[in-house]
């Protein structure tokens, strides 16, 4: 099952997070209505808030994430990074950003 179908089946809307739990937790943040659209900063920020809440719920205190919101989504990394710092790192979630 693809990511889109997985999130669709979970009935997740923009600003929410779909969670897949097998050997490890995988969080899919929903930042836009369609894959070809650009997310707004408000939707991105709301999705990061939802990610924080899911981390609390599942006692997850460390995340490894790609450079989300950039590249195809065309958000500025400096802005995205500040949202991640304010909404995750300053609240006790350790975040490691990796590059693919």
From Swiss-Prot:
<protein>
    <recommendedName>
        <fullName>Uncharacterized protein 032R</fullName>
    </recommendedName>
</protein>
<dbReference type="InterPro" id="IPR043472">
    <property type="entry name" value="Macro_dom-like"/>
</dbReference>
<dbReference type="InterPro" id="IPR050892">
    <property type="entry name" value="ADP-ribose_metab_enzymes"/>
</dbReference>
<dbReference type="GO" id="GO:0140291">
    <property type="term" value="P:peptidyl-glutamate ADP-deribosylation"/>
</dbReference>
